[in-house]
C-alpha cells in the first residue's frame, strides 16, 4: 500500500494523542485505529505482545506502553498523526512531553471504572497545556461496564463539562453498537464482521428511544447556546441541521468549553470508526490552535509569533529523543512554522548551536517512511541532530526563535549502581548518557562519599525499566542497590548578616575574598527553588566577582548541611564584602560564596524534606479497617474515603519512604483483593525522630 504524502492542506491534518489510565485500553485503541486506517494488516494484540505501537522489548513483555511513538495514518482523506502516551504514573515525562506538541487528544476511559486516579492526573496535565479532548468510554463489553456511571465520574471527579454524543446499544456481553445522537441513528456491528470493519446504520431500538430523546435534548441545548442564530432557530422550534450541530460541537471542543463523549469496545472492534470520524469532525487542525509563541534567543521579553504556515520562517520543537537500532539517535520534532528540506542547516536556538537535518521520516510506530521536506503542522523523526535534546527549539538561522519548553519533575526515588567489571564501567557511562538524552526525568549523580553512581527516576517501575534497558541495549552488567528516597533539605527562617572571609597567604599570590550575606526561605512563582540577589554598592566587590559568589553558593547547595541532600527553596542576598587588589580572584570569591552559604544555612534552622505520595487504595469493605490502620502505621494521613462501584476507596498522603514493599503487604492483608495506585504529590518536612535517623545514617553515626 503506497503511503500518501504529507497533506499540504492543514485543515485536513490532526495531531492527536491518546491518553488514559494504565489499563483503560489506549494501545488497543491505537492498534484498531491503525488497522481501520489501513496501515496494519494484522491487528496487534497487547495480550500477545504484538502491538505495533509498543516497540521496545520491555513494553511487549509488560503489556504497557512506555515511550510515545508517533504514527501517521489516513482516514477519509484526512491525515492523523497519533502519539501514543503511556498511562503508568512513573512515565509522567512521556505524557507531559507529548501533550506539549499535540493539538487535541482522545481521553480513553475504562467503562467499568470510569475516572481512575491516573486518568485524573493526565487530565490535569492536559488542562495545563489547554489540549482540547474528546472522551472515549472503552471496554463497554466488560462485565460491570456502565456508560452512565463513567460519564458521572467525569463530571464529579474531573469537574468537566461533558456532552454525550453517543449512547451504548446493549452492554457487557450484549454490547452491539452505539446510538449516534447527532444523526439520531443506531450504528450496530454485525456478528459476522469479526474485525468490525463494517457496521449497519439502523433505526434507534424502541427501548432506547426515550433515553436517546432525553440526551439529544441536552446536546441540542448545549449546541444552541454557542451561537445567537442557532439559539433563535432552536427556540423557534426549527430542526437544526447535522452540519450546524457538528459545527457547534466542534466550536465547543476546540475552545475546551465542553468534551464530547463517545463509547465502544476497541478490543471487540466496535465503535472505533465513529470515534475516528469524531477526531476529524471535532478536534482542532494545526490552524485552529493559537499560533506558536516564543522569544528572541537571549531576550526573554521580546516576543515572537509564528503562524502554522509554510510561508513563515522555519521553527520546530524537539519533544523526544529515542535510540534506534540502525540510525542511532532519532529526534522527534513538531514543526510549528515554515518548511525545511532534509540536509538543510538549521540552528538549535535554545543552545545556540548549528545542526544539520540528516534524513527526515514520517514514522509509523517503528517503521519509517522517508520524506524530502518537513512542513508546518506536522510531526517528523529526524536523524543527524547532535546536540538537540528534549525541549530544544530548532529554527531558521536568519530568523531565530526559542519556543516555550516543557517542565519536568525532579526524581523522587534513587538507586545506586555498581558495574561488575572495568569494561562495564565504560558501557555504563555511555548507556547513562544515552538514556538521559531520551528521558529528562532520569537524573544521575556521583555519590561523593561512596563513589557510586546514583540514578534517580519517577518510581520503582521507571528505574526497573531503565536498568533493564542498560542490560539489554547496552549489555551493562551491574549490581543495583536498594531503592532510596530522594530527600532534600531546606531552611525555615531568615538569617541576616552572615560573613565569611577566605584568605590564604603562603608565598606567591595569595587568595582573598570577604562576603556578607543573608538567606531566607523562598519559592518562586514559576516553581523556582533558588534566587540570588546582589545589593552590593559602591564597588565594594567588583562586578565581575559577583557571579562567582552565586556559583559558589549553588555548589554548596548540591550537598546540604544536615545529611548531604540538595538544599532547595532559599534566596541568597549578597549585602557587602571586601576584596584585595592583588589577591582577589573569581576562585577566591567562589570559595567564599560556598563557605558562607554553609555557615548561614546551618544557622537558618535547616530541615529535611521528603517526597509525599498521593496514594489511593481500592478495597472491599471487609478490609477497610486493616487498610486504614496500615496506612496510619506508615505515617499516612487519610484525606478522604468514598464508595466506588461496591468497593471502598481510601485516599491518603503517605511518605514515599514508607511505601516500599507496600504491594506485597497490601496483598497479604486483603487476600489479594485490594489494589492501589500512587502519584507524587509534594515535598514535606520530615518529623524530628525520622530526621534524626536519616542524619545518623547519612553521617554514619
From Swiss-Prot:
Q: Which UniProt keywords apply?
A: Cytoplasm, Elongation factor, GTP-binding, Nucleotide-binding, Protein biosynthesis
The answer to whether UniProt assigns keyword Protein biosynthesis to this entry is yes
Residue stretches making up the tr-type G domain: 11-287
Could you cite one Gene Ontology molecular function of this protein?
A: translation elongation factor activity
Cytoplasm: is it a keyword of this entry?
yes
Write out the function statement from the record. Answer: Catalyzes the GTP-dependent ribosomal translocation step during translation elongation. During this step, the ribosome changes from the pre-translocational (PRE) to the post-translocational (POST) state as the newly formed A-site-bound peptidyl-tRNA and P-site-bound deacylated tRNA move to the P and E sites, respectively. Catalyzes the coordinated movement of the two tRNA molecules, the mRNA and conformational changes in the ribosome.
Please give the PANTHER family that the UniProt record associates with this protein.
RIBOSOME-RELEASING FACTOR 2, MITOCHONDRIAL, TRANSLATION ELONGATION FACTOR G-RELATED
Q: Show the NCBIfam families listed in the entry.
A: EF-G, PRK12740.1-5, small_GTP
What's the name of the protein? Elongation factor G
The root-end lineage is: Bacteria, Bacillati, Actinomycetota, Actinomycetes, Mycobacteriales
Its gene is fusA
Amino acid at each position: 500500500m503506497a503511503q500518501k504524502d504529507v497533506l499540504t492542506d492543514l485543515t485536513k491534518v490532526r495531531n492527536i494523542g491518546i491518553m488514559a489510565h494504565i489499563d483503560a485500553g489506549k494501545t488497543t485503541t491505537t492498534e484498531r485505529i491503525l488497522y481501520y486506517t489501513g496501515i496494519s494488516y494484522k491487528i496487534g494484540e497487547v495480550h500477545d505482545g504484538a502491538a505495533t505501537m509498543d516497540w521496545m522489548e520491555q513494553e511487549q513483555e509488560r503489556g504497557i506502553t512506555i515511550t510515545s511513538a508517533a504514527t501517521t495514518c489516513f482516514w477519509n482523506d484526512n491525515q492523523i498523526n497519533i502519539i501514543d502516551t503511556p498511562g503508568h504514573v512513573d512515565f509522567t515525562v512521556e505524557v507531559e512531553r507529548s501533550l506539549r506538541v499535540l493539538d487535541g487528544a482522545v481521553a480513553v476511559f475504562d467503562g467499568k471504572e470510569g475516572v481512575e486516579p491516573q486518568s485524573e492526573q493526565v487530565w490535569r496535565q492536559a488542562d495545563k497545556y489547554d489540549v482540547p479532548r474528546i472522551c472515549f468510554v472503552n471496554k463497554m463489553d466488560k462485565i460491570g461496564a456502565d456508560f452512565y456511571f463513567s460519564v458521572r465520574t467525569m463530571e464529579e471527579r474531573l469537574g468537566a463539562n461533558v456532552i454525550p454524543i453517543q449512547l451504548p446499544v446493549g452492554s457487557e456481553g450484549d454490547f452491539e453498537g452505539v446510538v449516534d445522537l447527532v444523526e439520531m441513528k443506531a450504528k450496530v456491528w454485525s456478528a459476522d464482521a469479526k474485525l468490525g470493519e463494517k457496521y449497519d446504520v439502523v433505526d434507534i431500538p424502541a427501548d432506547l428511544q426515550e433515553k436517546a430523546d432525553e440526551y439529544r435534548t441536552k446536546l441540542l441545548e448545549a449546541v444552541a447556546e454557542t451561537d445567537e442564530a442557532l439559539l433563535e432557530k432552536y427556540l423557534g422550534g426549527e430542526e437544526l441541521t447535522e452540519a450546524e450541530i457538528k459545527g457547534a460541537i466542534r466550536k465547543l471542543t476546540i475552545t475546551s468549553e465542553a468534551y464530547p463523549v463517545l463509547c465502544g469496545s476497541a478490543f471487540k472492534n466496535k465503535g472505533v470508526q465513529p470515534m475516528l470520524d469524531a477526531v476529524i469532525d471535532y478536534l482542532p487542525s494545526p490552524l485552529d490552535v493559537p499560533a506558536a509563541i516564543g522569544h528572541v534567543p537571549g531576550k526573554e521579553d521580546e516576543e515572537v509569533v509564528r503562524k502554522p504556515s509554510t510561508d513563515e520562517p522555519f521553527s520546530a520543537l524537539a519533544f523526544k529523543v529515542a535510540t534506534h537500532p540502525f540510525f542511532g539517535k532519532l529526534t522527534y520534532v513538531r514543526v510549528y512554522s515554515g518548511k525545511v528540506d532534509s540536509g538543510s542547516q538549521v540552528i538549535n536556538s535554545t543552545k545556540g548551536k548549528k545542526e544539520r537535518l540528516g534524513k527526515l521520516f514520517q514514522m509509523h510506530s517503528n517503521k519509517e517512511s522517508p520524506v524530502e521536506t518537513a512542513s508546518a503542522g506536522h510531526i517528523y523523526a529526524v536523524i543527524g541532530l547532535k546536540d538537540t535534546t528534549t525541549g530544544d527549539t530548532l529554527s531558521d538561522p536568519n530568523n531565530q526563535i526559542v519556543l516555550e519548553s516543557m517542565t519536568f519533575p525532579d526524581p523522587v526515588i534513587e538507586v545506586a549502581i555498581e558495574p561488575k567489571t572495568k569494561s562495564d564501567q565504560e558501557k555504563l557511562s555511555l548507556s547513562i548518557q544515552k538514556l538521559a538524552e531520551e528521558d529528562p526525568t532520569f537524573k544521575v549523580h556521583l555519590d561523593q562519599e561512596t563513589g557510586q553512581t546514583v540514578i534517580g527516576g519517577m518510581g520503582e517501575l521507571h528505574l526497573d525499566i531503565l536498568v533493564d534497558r542498560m542490560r539489554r541495549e547496552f549489555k551493562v552488567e551491574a549490581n543495583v542497590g536498594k531503592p532510596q528516597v530522594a530527600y532534600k533539605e531546606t531552611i525555615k527562617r531568615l538569617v541576616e548578616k552572615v560573613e565569611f572571609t577566605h584568605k590564604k597567604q603562603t608565598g606567591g599570590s595569595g587568595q582573598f575574598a570577604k562576603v556578607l550575606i543573608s538567606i531566607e526561605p523562598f519559592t518562586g512563582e514559576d516553581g523556582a527553588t533558588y534566587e540570588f540577589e546582589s545589593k552590593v554598592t559602591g564597588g565594594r566587590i567588583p562586578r565581575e566577582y559577583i557571579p562567582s559568589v552565586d556559583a559558589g553558593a549553588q555548589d554548596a547547595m548540591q550537598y546540604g548541611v544536615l545529611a548531604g541532600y540538595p538544599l532547595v527553596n532559599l534566596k541568597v542576598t549578597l549585602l557587602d564584602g571586601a576584596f584585595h587588589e592583588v589577591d582577589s580572584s573569581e576562585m577566591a570569591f567562589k570559595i567564599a560564596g560556598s563557605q558562607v552559604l554553609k555557615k548561614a544555612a546551618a544557622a537558618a534552622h535547616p530541615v529535611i524534606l521528603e517526597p509525599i505520595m498521593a496514594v489511593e487504595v481500592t478495597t472491599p469493605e471487609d478490609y477497610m479497617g486493616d487498610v486504614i490502620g496500615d496506612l496510619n502505621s506508615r505515617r499516612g494521613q487519610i484525606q478522604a474515603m468514598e464508595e466506588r462501584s461496591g468497593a471502598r476507596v481510601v485516599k491518603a498522603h503517605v511518605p514515599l519512604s514508607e511505601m516500599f514493599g507496600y504491594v506485597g503487604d497490601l496483598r497479604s492483608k486483603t487476600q489479594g483483593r485490594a489494589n492501589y495506585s500512587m502519584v507524587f504529590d509534594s515535598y514535606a518536612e520530615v518529623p524530628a525522630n525520622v530526621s534524626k535517623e536519616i542524619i545518623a545514617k547519612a553521617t554514619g553515626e
